[in-house]
Amino acid sequence: MYLSRSAEWSALESHYQDISHQAMIDLFSTDPNRHERFSLSFNAIHLDYSKNRISARTMELLMDLVRRSGIEKKRRQMFEGEQINFTEHRSVLHTALRRPPGYTMTIDGNDVASEVSDVLDQMKAFCKKVISGEWKGYTGKRITDVVNIGIGGSDLGPFMVTEALKPFAHGKLKVHFVSNVDGSHLVETLRGLNPETTLFIIASKTFTTQETLANAVSARAWFLVKAGNRDHVAKHFVAVSTNREKVEEFGIDPDNMFRFWDWVGGRYSLWSAIGLSIALYLGFDRFRELLAGAHAMDEHFLNAPLEENMPMILAMLGIWYNNFFGAHSQAIIPYDQYLHRFPAYLQQLDMESNGKRVDRAGHEVDYATGPVIWGEPGTNAQHAFFQLLHQGTEIVPVDFIVSLKSQNPVGEHHDMLVANCFAQSEALMKGKSEAEARAELEAAGLSGGDLEKLLPHKLFPGNRPTNTIVLDELNPFNLGSLIALYEHKVFVQGVVWNINSFDQWGVELGKQLAKAILPEFDAVDPVETHDASTNALINRYRQFRNGLKFPKSNQLKMF
């Protein structure tokens, strides 16, 4: 039966009518154990989901819906390597990358465990050489800077992790990331670097990704201006790829190619050799801790009862708001500056996975799927868009993420940070009533018409849902668990919505059209092969590119 016509869906629609007008503050007043009822801890991660518009009955109905989806079977299929990415005929086995030694798994006749172990050993040996200074550049100097050139999952994950774990870096290497094909990204990154002491990681599964190869070729040209001899490329460029021929053609020693597999999706690839920049920056042992943390969350996801399962709970709360409250975006607010790239990382993880409009049978869905994910670190976010969260017309569920321990204890800074995090979750839940606002204005000396005019602007409706995820400390193990928590949340939602969370065909169309437009910039005659708007834009750029002056706008006469 179609999801939106199932008995479980209908029960939630009916329940929404009963609970949608209830105020969370009243639910807390009538249930002194509400926090204990709606919170749980796993290792060093605590999830408080009590500030949601839910009751025990809500959670029962949500768990009925997730059971209807066959989540336990789908979960087993993913972990056992079945081809759940059916549009690309691929297994989904990023979880295999973080399993400890000793397991066995065979996919298409290949010993997955052995292959993963071999690549990890290769990464470990390489990291040891570079960090110790044994690996030297073409002039005999040790490497001081590592530049990762990749895009999408080859950039977002490693960049986020290296930023998040800066306090755990060994300090012998600086790491930089280039992703955008905009030449400014490469130029500004290379400014001040020394070709003699710079190592480039070219991260591209096929070694044909347009943006990555453009940046790699330009980086090589920059390097050769000083190095001169193309033979020196092998000492300063390594690859994470599966295309040995293209890697060797570029000038990279195939012994310095770190492989990964088609069962590793880009947005899940930081656990693979794509994480080489992480391992170089932190040291391989720290990278192993990151993997161990993710594996711990994998085990929790596999074994915890649905009602006590963090990814399941987060996933179903998201569905509750997206599909029944019509809340089609979610804010991720880490109260930790080291996590400043975490919202951007989650954008790809969530929106590329679940931004789908057809179900697994190819039919258009009649319900919302993946929400818009956005966010910034607190407290910066408070001074940017919290106005909308508190008093806007849209309900935006929020995930707050905060660490109890600061890596940089300075005065009362961390106390202030944590106080703001907890205060925002309380404020979004409680709001401010007319009586409270009136009393505040009267205490400030306002009365009569002035008070009445200002009063509506001082009201906060409250009843805005939030989760608060509390880490004991942001360290490699806990970050690994946090990332895996969101990975599995996204997977569960995709299963419930009956979509394929592991392909990304929506990325392709624009890339195809860009390949057609690029040679048209060199056309002799005006371009007329597109719609009128696109033709005009192309021809305008061609005029500028060819050094012609633009015609003056008639509007200029107005000034």
From Swiss-Prot:
Sorted UniProt keywords: Cytoplasm, Gluconeogenesis, Glycolysis, Isomerase
UniProt main location, coarse: cytoplasm
Pathway: Carbohydrate biosynthesis; gluconeogenesis; Carbohydrate degradation; glycolysis; D-glyceraldehyde 3-phosphate and glycerone phosphate from D-glucose: step 2/4
Gene3D superfamilies: 1.10.1390.10, Glucose-6-phosphate isomerase like protein, domain 1
Reactions it catalyzes: alpha-D-glucose 6-phosphate = beta-D-fructose 6-phosphate
PROSITE patterns for the chain: P_GLUCOSE_ISOMERASE_1 (PS00765), P_GLUCOSE_ISOMERASE_2 (PS00174), P_GLUCOSE_ISOMERASE_3 (PS51463)
Keyword Cytoplasm on entry: yes
UniProt EC number: 5.3.1.9
Alphabetized HAMAP family for the sequence: G6P_isomerase (MF_00473)
Name the UniProt record assigns to this protein: Glucose-6-phosphate isomerase
